[in-house]
A protein has these predicted regions:
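Catalytic core of membrane glycerolipid acyltransferases/transacylases, capturing the structured
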Residues: 2-17, 28-31, 43-98
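Catalytic-site beta-strand/loop segments enriched in glycine and acidic/polar residues
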Residues: 111-140
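Residue-level preference for the first positions of well-ordered beta-strands
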Residues: 45-47, 90, 117-121, 149, ...
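Generic beta-sheet signal
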Residues: 72, 93, 121, 153-155
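A cross-family acyltransferase "interaction/gating" segment
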Residues: 80-82, 130-205, 212-213
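A membrane-cytosol interface segment of integral membrane proteins
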Residues: 91-112, 117
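Membrane-interfacial terminal anchoring regions of lipid-handling membrane enzymes
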Residues: 1-11, 18-21, 39, 44, ...
Length: 224
């Protein structure tokens, strides 16, 4: 893993995304997680908005649609995870700072203008996957500025019989080790991505309205 990540700076953006996708798919296979996405691709330069259940979400989305993620700044200081995130072009956000949010919006806008996918988790935290919290819409401004599609994606984790499982949930005071134990205790988990119709920022150039529309689409995707 270390050697693979060390090679990332020497790869082209397309090669980096391909490597990220393959590495993520491999990790899911090791953990016994089967990925199901109901769309083969999404339009270039999309701002992906998704509900947030687990640390696995990043690998699930990357295995289907390689992307740059926006993460809270604290992650940068985490052992190994922070280093890996930084090497994979993660955009770090200092939560609670409006000034920094404007800077991050500028970074996201530039990436979208290059045709890159960027993913945010507008709930701002994780849940157990049974519901969706309210969305914070500040970072949706980047899609408006870049005139980029807003792509809602609902993440749901299910057992083979289709029933809900909270095994992948990384919420509360659960440690990463406890989370891993819960995941591997299940012989097979289905990570399901429901890709909603993209939202046009031209039709709805308002962050608050876009937030509500994106959340409604994700709630519907989880219930499906």
């Amino acid at each position: 893993v270390v050697l693979t990540v060390a090679a990332v700076p020497f790869l082209s953006p397309a090669q980096q995304l391909g490597l990220r996708q393959r590495w993520s798919a491999r990790l899911l296979k090791i953990l016994g997680i089967h990925l199901s996405a109901d769309a083969p691709f999404i339009g270039p330069g999309s701002l992906i908005v998704a509900n947030h259940v687990s640390w696995l979400d990043i690998f699930v989305i990357n295995a289907a649609f390689p992307t740059t993620f926006v993460s809270k700044a604290e992650v940068r200081g985490w052992p190994l995870a922070g280093w890996l995130a930084a090497k994979h072009e993660t955009v770090f956000l200092r939560r609670g700072s409006r000034g920094h949010a404007r800077i991050v919006n500028g970074e996201i806008t530039a990436l979208l203008a290059q045709g890159r996918h960027v993913t945010i988790f507008p709930e701002g935290t994780t849940t157990d996957g049974s519901h969706v919290l309210g969305f914070h819409g500040a970072l949706l401004q980047a899609a408006i500025e870049a005139r980029a599609p807003l792509q809602p994606i609902a993440i749901a984790y299910r057992l083979p019989d289709g029933s809900y499982t909270r095994a992948p949930a990384y919420d509360g005071d659960l440690s990463l080790l406890d989370s891993l134990r819960a995941i591997v205790a299940e012989p097979r988990i289905l990570a399901r991505l429901r890709v909603a119709d993209p939202l046009s920022v031209t039709d709805t150039p308002d962050r608050k309205a876009l937030s509500h529309l994106a959340r409604d689409a994700i709630v519907a995707g989880i219930a499906d």
